[in-house]
């Protein structure tokens, strides 16, 4: 098993025997670059018996999600502007969602540069319980040396469940918090969500829509989420097209909103206003979009299905934004909103792992040192 250490800010911690990046072939001699294996004796009674799935914190409103969706509505509605107006004011084509978010969140606040270091290897199969136990002990030792009260160790889904079982039954590892790697890394979670979207929307005609842009043989890979980049691009194009259809008549018919949107978009792209300053106009557009979606959903089941599709992909965007901007509350809220779709698509092992992960993350505020929690979530 290999691993990496991520520290923020850079040079905040030093890892003894860290493996430096080199060119060419690496030759390991003896115990250099390796962690001594600590055998793990599995107890007769599984530690999972002491883990109870409790209800997650329920909120009546999600301010972090609503603010993000308002900015998304401004981006989506910008494509409803008349072509002549776009060419006159912006010259080139409008940016994609990623480009728009990069400009909109350019002043999101101060940040620190992180450092990634390669850790020594554990010469065991990663699925071996002794290997996971050794990794947790190594992380715990490094945590104590850095005088940190809490240490986060990330694993992929199968290893996360094993690490959770081990850490729960070992009092000496109480400061170590196993983290579901696929819940904490945005591309992996997005793969699962896009897979859920593909399964839920199977047979709806979405495949035929994608086939107009992508090769027919690549569409199944897009629907399953295995072709991640294509899936994100395809869903983004579909959302953009549907959003324009929903909003175009409403915005063009209202000259006041059209003028406000055009002016706001120009200022936002020019860096003249911040996200907070776009709030009044963004709220209007978001409400207009929501009202129109409710109106269309009431017409028939087909319209309701496609509106639900838009809502599903909005969650993908929210989660991506949370990871890129380091928005802790948006991260938790978007993950909670994804849970029903994991169950609907019968991804039960992943739904179980995400629920346990969220349960642990919600408990951090009470269990962690206040200073460490503030630095971790800011």
What are these regions (language model features)?
Residues 1-378:
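Buried hydrophobic core signal strongest for RNase H-like alpha/beta domains in large
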């Amino acid at each position: 098993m290999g691993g990496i250490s991520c520290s923020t800010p850079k040079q905040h911690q030093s890892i003894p025997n860290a493996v430096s990046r080199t060119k060419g072939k690496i030759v390991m001699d003896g115990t250099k670059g390796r962690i001594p294996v600590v055998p793990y004796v599995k107890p007769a009674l599984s530690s999972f018996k002491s883990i109870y799935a409790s209800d997650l914190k329920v909120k009546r409103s999600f301010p972090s999600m609503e603010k993000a969706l308002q900015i998304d509505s401004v981006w989506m509605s910008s494509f409803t502007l008349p072509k002549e107006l776009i060419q006159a004011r912006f010259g080139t084509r409008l940016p994609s969602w990623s480009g728009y978010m990069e400009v909109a969140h350019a002043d999101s606040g101060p940040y620190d540069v992180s450092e990634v270091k390669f850790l020594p290897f554990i010469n065991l199969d990663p699925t071996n319980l002794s290997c996971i136990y050794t990794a947790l002990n190594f992380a715990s030792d490094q945590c104590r040396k850095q005088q940190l009260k809490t240490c986060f160790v990330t694993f992929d889904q199968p290893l996360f469940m094993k690490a959770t079982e081990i850490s729960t039954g070992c009092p000496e590892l109480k400061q170590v918090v196993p983290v579901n790697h696929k819940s904490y890394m945005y591309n992996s979670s997005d793969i699962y969500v896009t897979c859920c979207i593909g399964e839920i929307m199977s047979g709806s005609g979405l495949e035929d829509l994608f086939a107009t842009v992508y090769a027919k043989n690549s569409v199944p890979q897009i629907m399953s989420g295995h072709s991640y980049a294509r899936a994100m691009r395809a869903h983004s194009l579909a959302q953009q097209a549907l959003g324009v259809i929903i909003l175009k008549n409403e915005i063009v018919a209202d000259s006041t909103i059209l003028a406000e949107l055009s002016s706001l978009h120009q200022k936002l792209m020019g860096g003249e206003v911040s996200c907070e300053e776009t709030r009044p106009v963004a709220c209007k557009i978001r409400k207009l979009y929501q009202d129109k979606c409710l109106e269309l959903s009431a017409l028939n089941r087909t319209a309701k299905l496609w509106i639900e599709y838009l809502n599903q992909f909005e969650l993908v965007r929210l989660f991506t934004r949370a990871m890129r901007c380091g928005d802790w509350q948006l991260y938790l809220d978007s993950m909670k909103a994804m849970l029903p779709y994991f169950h609907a698509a019968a991804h039960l092992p992943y739904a179980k792992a995400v629920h346990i992960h969220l349960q642990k993350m919600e408990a951090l505020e009470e269990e962690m040192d206040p200073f460490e929690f503030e630095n971790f979530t800011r």
